[in-house]
Amino acid sequence: MTDSATANGDDRDPEIELFVKAGIDGESIGNCPFSQRLFMILWLKGVVFNVTTVDLKRKPADLHNLAPGTHPPFLTFNGDVKTDVNKIEEFLEETLTPEKYPKLAARHRESNTAGIDIFSKFSAYIKNTKQQNNAALERGLTKALRKLDDYLNTPLPEEIDTNTHGDEKGSQRKFLDGDELTLADCNLLPKLHVVKIVAKKYRNYDIPAEMTGLWRYLKNAYARDEFTNTCAADSEIELAYADVARRLSRS
């Protein structure tokens, strides 16, 4: 049995509604990398869908009945409620398929795990209250970012040209897996954006300028509507971490 929109000769778009976390005002997009991940996937698929922001402080009764006990993001696909982000991603990739919809899976397995430990290192760094631990935790974050930078600067197999010489060997690709956004980017970029905004605001930490691959990656991401138009406002992200980012003390 298949849910494919093209099954049985039915070429109509499925009915999809994505429910994402609302911001402080109860209406705009809130800080939620998982919501943004699904928002980006649907946008990149080119499928028609509706987006509803959910105010967690006053969740409407009809939404409570739709997905009881579930926080956004979740979606309805032709009336069926789906709540697990990883399973939703897998379902959309298997259901919204070529020729009608683009394949978004990364071709290289390493692209799916690039930057995988950045967010956990960032969380430990930003939640720390002890001044004496700050430098070590900052180094941990920088090391994780550098590992991602190395991956982005290392040519993918298809980029390697036998005629390439010397300092021209570095990768110039736009994203993790090439010049097109993939599921790997939809997972990593929302988290990377949060790290960039919050670390600067609460620890005055900048991603090092010498990480040219990482900055190239971010620059290319910010040039894409699928990313920038699904981001929460910087102030929204900062507010979300106001109680999480602890003030450092010497005690």
Curated annotation (Swiss-Prot):
Membrane topology reported for the UniProt record: Single-pass membrane protein
Entries under PROSITE patterns matching the protein: GST_CTER
Molecular-function annotations in GO: chloride channel activity; oxidoreductase activity
Annotated compartments: Golgi apparatus; Cytoplasm, Cytoskeleton, Microtubule organizing center, Centrosome; Cytoplasm, Cytoskeleton; Cytoplasm, Cell cortex
Pfam families named in the record: CLIC-like_N, GST_C_2
Domain notes: The active G-site contains a monothiol Cys-X-X-Ser motif which mediates glutathione-dependent redox catalysis.
GO biological-process terms attached to the record: auditory receptor cell stereocilium organization; chloride transport; diet induced thermogenesis; inner ear receptor cell stereocilium organization; neuromuscular process controlling balance; protein localization; response to dietary excess; sensory perception of sound
Gene it is expressed from: Clic5
Annotated protein name in UniProt: Chloride intracellular channel protein 5
Organism whose genome encodes this protein: Rattus norvegicus
Transmembrane segments: 34-54
GO CC term, one of those recorded: stereocilium bundle
Description of how activity is regulated: Inhibited by F-actin.
EC number in record: 1.8.-.-
